[in-house]
Amino acid sequence: MCERQRRIYLAGDSTVQSYTKVMEPQTGWGQVFYEYFKGHDECVERQSTDSRFTQSRQYELPGVVIDNRAMAGRSSRNYRVEGRLLDIADSMKEGDYLFVQFGHNDANKAKEERYVEPEKFGESLMPYVEVCRKAKATCVLITAIAMRNCDDNPEGKFTYSFPEYREAMIAFARKENIPLLDLGKATTELCEKTGAEGCKQLFLWVEPGEYPNSKHKDGKQDNAHLKVAGARAFAGVLRGLIKAYNQDDRLDFIKAQLR
């Protein structure tokens, strides 16, 4: 019997999720993250073999498996309530990783099932840490990615998305000694360099008829979700953050898998 490969589980929202062709060009960074790993040209993609949630996708690489369990509209709260964290826990093994990116939907006061007060964000993230500790796996916290929010700000500047949640996650990671990758900061800096117009190529700005067989066939001007180019750019930023991580050796296995 073949030894099971170590896995990197992804728990998050629509900005991380893998999508089917009918949603093109919408793409989550978790859908293309595998492209930054050694042997990416040999990657086998399939539905996750041991998940009961049909949107879950596995990316089987020579040295590791990326198991994307992210789902649109989920916060750290309703992701857990729906049993999605338990779904990961049921298959997690010693040596695995769990990357956790939430914040976008936690801030949605209009939807009670999603909302988490910033002051309680750490408390809402704790079960993800506990699942990893029980399995002797490594939890990695990731701050929410940037939005194209320049149109809403004076002088067209990009600012951190959901800053109170970013700050709460950073404080929680420090308190619990959890590796943290500040993807929110790094992608905001990327957007600032790319500029307001350039970022339309990263986010889900689509002309009517551009994708006639897609759910976005009528066009879209979406400043939260990503196109393929944006997902690849943001996944590349995450790769850089992993390589630069120097707080301890907990990410060394993943560093060795990156190209």
Say what each PLM segment does.
Residues 14, 72-74, 145, 186:
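Short, solvent-exposed coil/turn elements at secondary-structure transition points
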Residues 44, 74-75, 182:
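Short, solvent-exposed coil/turn linker segments
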